[in-house]
Regions:
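Conserved GTP-binding G-domain of TRAFAC-class P-loop NTPases and closely related GTPase folds
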Residues: 2-8, 13-28, 95, 106-146
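Glycine-rich phosphate-binding loop used to anchor ATP phosphates in small-molecule kinases
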Residues: 51-100
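Conserved substrate/cofactor phosphate-moiety recognition/catalytic segment
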Residues: 16-72, 118
């Protein structure tokens, strides 16, 4: 039975690092990664715009369905912290009759921002401080004081 692995965590919490390590240990062609950042990169050079998010969400769901329908496991690499998003993935897994696993990632805000600055210095995607603060205020307020 195919499975959906939902990665959950703020930006810079280690989701993609975990994903990459996991993929190294999977047989080639057995698992597909669906990543909203990658879809944004394909559509708009990685630039986030609210206007484009409807298309990003549509492609994300389409790719998940295609993967499971092809007998593959699917990793959903995004923050996946919003309760509506979690409910959507549970509903989709039920509809597709597949297992769903949630892998949770947490680091304090200070650690995430340190990783964010390092990512920027290495030429990677930088998440604005305001966006990072919003994630922590909304989902992990206790992590702001650490």
């Amino acid at each position: 039975m195919s499975k959906i692995i939902v990665l959950q965590g703020t930006p810079c919490s280690g989701k993609s690092t975990w994903r990459n390590a996991y993929m190294e240990n999977q047989p080639i062609g057995s698992t597909v990664v669906v990543c909203r950042d990658d879809i944004r990169l394909e559509l708009n050079n990685g630039i986030f715009t609210l206007k484009l998010e409807k298309e990003v969400r549509k492609l994300e769901k389409q790719r998940i369905i295609e993967g499971i329908s092809s007998g593959l496991d699917v990793i959903i690499d995004a923050t996946n912290l919003n309760p509506k998003t979690i409910a959507r993935w549970n509903k989709l897994a039920s509809k597709l009759n597949c297992e769903i696993i949630f892998e949770k990632f947490y680091v304090p805000y200070s650690v995430a921002m340190k990783r964010n600055r390092k990512r920027k210095a290495e030429g990677g995607l930088y998440i604005p401080k305001k966006v990072m603060l919003d994630f922590y205020q909304r989902y992990y307020p206790e992590g702001l004081s650490i």
